[in-house]
């Protein structure tokens, strides 16, 4: 089966720290970069939205008494730091990459511009979108759905630590069962919590298929883009 043309990969900040409790884990980063390099080699155009939870979470700051808008702005800056770290790791591995930020930050990355992003993707460069949506109160999951729709991605891929969507937390419930496929309506109605409601709704409205998979499994990203049985696919059916 031929790979998809263009994907948007949502990579959490927590994933970047691997087994550590903060920052970046070199071995984990190298593993992600290797998987991304493999799909780029297939001719797949790759956009990435990265979270910031390994450095700062806006919701956590708000719980500590910060103004939520201020805390979310700090969280958005954390995602830009992660975008730069990921770009550097990709470039050191020989993968051309660019950073676009939701708000313009001079000398750090280009401000997001849809046509420019598509040109970079078509030229074979990985485009990493930092800064979330550029607005407080929106998660990076929503940013991923938004950017996926804007760049006309064929698939939105949510990279997680589990190999799909389950009926319950598989770490707590031994009877939890993995879904092979789901509709967005089912996922929202059952409050499965894989994405926030705004992100789910945007995917549903834009008819954007989502695959939830375990990015820590070697080769999982390549199997997803090749259409193999990996993770859980969520769509409008």
From Swiss-Prot:
Pathway: Pyrimidine metabolism; CTP biosynthesis via de novo pathway; UDP from UMP (UMPK route): step 1/1. InterPro entries: AceGlu_kinase-like_sf, Asp/Glu/Uridylate_kinase, Uridylate_kinase, Uridylate_kinase_bac. The keyword Membrane does not apply. ATP binds at residues 10-13, 53, 57, 160, 166, 169. GO terms for cellular component: cytosol. One of its GO terms (molecular function) is ATP binding. Disulfide bonds: none annotated. One of its GO terms (biological process) is 'de novo' CTP biosynthetic process. It is found in: Cytoplasm. Keywords: ATP-binding, Cytoplasm, Kinase, Nucleotide-binding, Pyrimidine biosynthesis, Transferase. UMP binds at residues 52, 72, 133-140. It is an enzyme of class 2 (transferase). Its EC number is 2.7.4.22. Inhibited by UTP. Pfam families: AA_kinase. The keyword Methyltransferase does not apply. It catalyses: UMP + ATP = UDP + ADP. Catalyzes the reversible phosphorylation of UMP to UDP. NCBIfam families: pyrH_bact (TIGR02075). Homohexamer. Belongs to the UMP kinase family. This is Uridylate kinase. It comes from Thiobacillus denitrificans (strain ATCC 25259 / T1).
